[in-house]
């Protein structure tokens, strides 16, 4: 039980701070980039200029999280079927 011993040695104020860091890190690396990928996949051909500019800014901001999902996401359009 080394984890419980580690938690008991921390000051009382440290646990909420660690939980807040974990929540913000999870949102930055997982939640927002996944929502951004789904939004781009759904709206790519219907976006206006302002929406596309905002999306590009968010891609720049959340790039580390997007890199984490990049190997698992396929954004290519479906083909016309077999030739």
Curated annotation (Swiss-Prot):
GO terms for molecular function: oxidoreductase activity, acting on NAD(P)H, quinone or similar compound as acceptor; quinone binding. Keywords: Membrane, NAD, NADP, Plastoquinone, Quinone, Thylakoid, Translocase, Transmembrane, Transmembrane helix, Transport. Its EC number is 7.1.1.-. The chain crosses the membrane at residues 17-37, 53-73. It is found in: Cellular thylakoid membrane. The keyword rRNA-binding does not apply. GO terms for cellular component: plasma membrane-derived thylakoid membrane. Its main location: membrane. HAMAP family: NDH1_NDH1L. NDH-1 can be composed of about 15 different subunits; different subcomplexes with different compositions have been identified which probably have different functions. NDH-1 shuttles electrons from an unknown electron donor, via FMN and iron-sulfur (Fe-S) centers, to quinones in the respiratory and/or the photosynthetic chain. The immediate electron acceptor for the enzyme in this species is believed to be plastoquinone. Couples the redox reaction to proton translocation, and thus conserves the redox energy in a proton gradient. Cyanobacterial NDH-1 also plays a role in inorganic carbon-concentration. Belongs to the complex I NdhL subunit family. This is NAD(P)H-quinone oxidoreductase subunit L. The gene is ndhL.
């Amino acid at each position: 039980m080394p984890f419980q011993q580690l938690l008991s040695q921390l000051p009382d104020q440290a646990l909420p701070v660690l939980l807040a860091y974990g929540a913000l890190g999870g949102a930055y690396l997982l939640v927002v980039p996944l929502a951004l990928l789904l939004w781009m996949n759904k709206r790519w051909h219907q976006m206006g200029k302002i929406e596309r500019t905002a999306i590009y800014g968010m891609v720049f901001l959340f790039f580390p999280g997007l890199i984490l999902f990049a190997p698992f996401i396929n954004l290519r359009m479906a083909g016309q079927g077999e030739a």
